[in-house]
Amino acid sequence: FIGAALGALTAIPSIIKLFK
């Protein structure tokens, strides 16, 4: 579960870059 949460945390910045 912690690994999945960490993956989502690191994926958020990538998603933000996609929208910018």
UniProtKB/Swiss-Prot annotation:
Its main location: secreted. The modification Lysine amide is found at residue 20. Expressed by the venom gland. One of its GO terms (cellular component) is other organism cell membrane. GO terms for biological process: defense response to bacterium. One of its GO terms (molecular function) is toxin activity. It is found in: Secreted; Target cell membrane. Keywords: Amidation, Antibiotic, Antimicrobial, Membrane, Secreted, Target cell membrane, Target membrane, Toxin. The keyword Membrane applies. The keyword Metal-binding does not apply. Disulfide bonds: none annotated. Belongs to the non-disulfide-bridged peptide (NDBP) superfamily. Medium-length antimicrobial peptide (group 3) family. Ponericin-W subfamily. Has activity against Gram-positive bacteria. Has insecticidal and hemolytic activities. May act by disrupting the integrity of the bacterial cell membrane. This is U1-poneritoxin-Ni1a. It comes from Neoponera inversa (Ant). The lineage of its organism: Eukaryota, Metazoa, Ecdysozoa, Arthropoda, Hexapoda.
